[in-house]
Amino acid sequence: MDRLVNNTLSAWILIEMLHPGELEDIKSYLNKDLFLLNEQQKAVHDFESFYPIWEDERFQLNQLSSSKGEIQFQLYRHCFKFGEIEQYIRSIFNDEEIYNPDNRNCYGYTFMIDNEGYVLMDTLHVPMLMSALKYLKNDKNILIEETYQDHFEKFKHKCEEIIGNNKLTKEKLHKLDQLYSKYFALFETNYQGFFKQAIGIKYVTPNEQSNELNSFYISDMEFAKKDPNKTLTRYIHGVNDKDKKVIDENKEYIERYLKPDFYPDGRWPSLVEHRLSLMQQVAVNQITHDQMKISSVNGPPGTGKTTLLKDIFAHNIVERAKTFAELNKPSQAFKFQKIHETDQFPTAFLNDVHTHYKMVVASSNNGVVENISKDLPKISEVIRRDISSNFPEYEEAYQNVAKELNIFSEIAEKLIGEKAWGLFSGVFGRKANIDSVMTQVLTSCESKTLNKILIDAYNSVDINKEWKDAKQSFQKTLSKVKVLKKEINQGIKHFADFRKSEEQFIKYQQELVELNDENKNNNIDSLKQRKKNLENQITNVDTQINDLKEYIQLTKNKNSFKDKLKQFLGSNSSGAKDIDYEQRHADLLRKKIQFNDDKIRIDTEITMAVNEINERERRINRIEQNLMQLRKNQQGYLNFIKEHPDVVVPDIEFWRSGNEAYNMRQEKVLWTSDELQFERGLLFLKAIVLHKLILIGNAKSIQSGLYDFQRRYEYLDAAPEKVENAWNVIHLVFPVISTTFASFRSMYQTMPKDFIDYLYIDEAGQAIPQAAVGAIQRAQHLVAVGDPVQIEPVVTIDRNLIDSVRKAFNVPERLVSIESSVQTLSDGANIYGYWKGEEGEKQWIGVPLWVHRRCLNPMFTISNKIAYEQKMVLPEYIKSNELEGKVGRVSWIDVKGKANPKQFVKEQGIVVVEELKKDWVKAMKSGKQEPNVFIITPFSRVKSEIITFAKKELKPLVNQNINVKKWLHESIGTVHTFQGK
């Protein structure tokens, strides 16, 4: 087996085991309004000396409280401080001494008794840590879960024998304590003033769900260790740095992924003018086209992570609709076969080709996943009658198709609590959520269920005719999308030709200038002038030569007698003179020859210069012809942009450098048109119509699948195929399902690896890496969205202890550390992303989103500088609003006080509620029912205390018709509560 995967999972399992069982806050109190004596009571008491506490009059409820709930008592046995065992744990790994011990109050085991003293055996719990501590020293790789389950079952069984059907007594409790020490580690506290045995007082209402006290994730990690799938293996191994590709501002990749062929055929039907930002669209196109095992997107709240997920959801819906469009009639989507030959009836199985589009949204934050599932079906997502649009005809077309889906609107409205356009996503996860969904789709007696709606619709329509019409409509729109893409692809070809010809055009233009300059700067005239001067000089020399010849001849005739006499007498003067004339003659001849040579050379130069000019003229003519041809070639592109002014092209202006150009670029997307945007949104709605008709056309098969889902726990062992098919049916009814990681295993238990086709993890930066293992093991593809610089995962174990585990299993720090999250691991497994930070402290993040649509200055500028390297972009419309004075406010209120209980500072709460009262008064004076304000707190205790205080203060101030309690719970919460708002 892969050593890194095995060691990492082992380290994560051990870390999960190290979570202790914690006592409730020992300083907290129960409200006096609960009790008959009208006195507040401490929530936790010392219980070292046993007595029948259920008979204590202090804990007797008044009549109103009794009608709504009951008192129960939770016993915490063998209590200790976590720091006491932390040193022991670290000694196992040969780690150093603890200097700041963890002072959390922990217990060995716990159980509850009712208000009559009877033990509620189902509440018996032993933290797995107590089993691990008993055996860990001898074997760090021991399968603790198997050992724990075996010992816990034996412990519980013997506890039942000891208790029987009797009330708890001192003797029975002593026997339970002795039995506990046989199977689990026993620690007694050495701290003074701390309860060795404690009891908690709890007011329990019927709807309260007991929490699973052991880690939710260990079983799935043990399951994954046996046969990890490719997605989980990639998640743990990541990608080598040398293989990572920076996509931010990468011209090659951005232009590639924004070609029409990379755009999904379908998109979420938002307003046509509301296009995605540059990196949003790059992310959508890359994820849907490449179908990689792991993709990740990074951006703070407000950058459109959920928005891009909607487009990905729409893509998968359209792709499944294409498989439906291959059917002649909807009933062909199912096949009937017996699981066993002895079965009385066959099971209706959804054909395999239609099952490859199961989508799950998961998070560690329940509010996040519920928000997504409840937002998607909202009527405003598709039908926007009160919102103005640049394209009212497109909006009307969307609404007309959406009307065909209102058969499911009533059920969707019951599920999300407000007006809905149709059935699309389901809030699953906790049993209560699933039961609520199943009530609406199958079992409700108070309203018409989905099951009944489908059967009635099947009996009242000609389903095959409707199918034929809907299929034709879908295929027509799909063809239109392909035509528009082809049209834009032709534009891309024209643009490529234009860009290429533009480069050549510039080269030709430069060459023309150079050729013309060379022609202008030729030296023919100077050569001709020099030739003329030479010819004049030659003529002059010829004249001199002729004159000299004539003079010599004349002199020769006159002086012939004298010369002979002088010669006779021995005189030489005449001979000397003749020699001088001959010398002059020779010099003139040489000069003439030189002049003639120069003239010949100049003639040659003139000929060459003329030839060069003629050649340049011919080249100029050819270039001018080429330029004319290039202009013709460019006309195709010029015609395209004239006919498609709404299509953004990656021209020189688009890729211009500078901050202003960068901001402009980040807001735009390439190679799409308003019409293509519209048709893609329309295709999604028509795909949903096909899904609707598949449900109606297979009403009985859907009913069968829903009943199988209702009874899925009965079939886990006897007929697992039924359970798998039932989940396929559920994913057909609800294309998108949401759940928390904590509920994933209980939901999809026994489902094989790779069962989920697409897993989307929202706010992945808030989740510890091991939380997602069970989900990833069951997923073929993972898309993680989040922001590592926002809220980090909540880790309750000391950093040094985590480091000890990491070193013991020899795994990289990126996998096991206090800073690791699902987001950081997903980013590390994504080949596309961005190196963030300075040299030496660089961090690899996934595809970055830079356009922030939910922030105003000055907060935008502050955050951008602190956390985002000033890469974030404020949209143009927000900047325009700033010019009109629409900006945010930032201020601080300095309040001093002490925290009690826990993190709540009463003095701060008073000031906050006073400010809140002012907001309410202002809102009511302006005619509004309630103010538009959020109070965000760092801790849950602060939230609950402020809600309690505000409820009391607002009661006399606000009209009784207004549900103040509901408003407070929606408007006051922790940072997690308001993620995405």
Name these PLM-found stretches.
Residues F741-S746, S940, S971-F978:
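Conserved helicase motor
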Residues I162-Q286, K322, E326, F408, ...:
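Pre-P-loop entry segment of helicase/translocase ATPase cores
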Residues Y217-R275, R590-I593, D597-F755:
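Conserved helicase NTPase catalytic core signature
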Residues E792, K966-K981:
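Conserved RecA-like P-loop NTPase helicase motor core
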Residues N864-L954:
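Conserved helicase/translocase motor-coupling segment
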Residues Y398-E404, F408, A412, I416, ...:
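Long, amphipathic, heptad-repeat alpha-helical coiled-coil stalk/linker regions
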Residues E273-L442, Q583, R622-Q625, Q629-K632, ...:
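ASCE P-loop NTPase helicase motor core
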Residues M1-V204, G636, H644-K668, T672-K686:
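A helicase ATPase "motif cassette" and its flanking acidic/Ser/Thr-rich regulatory loops
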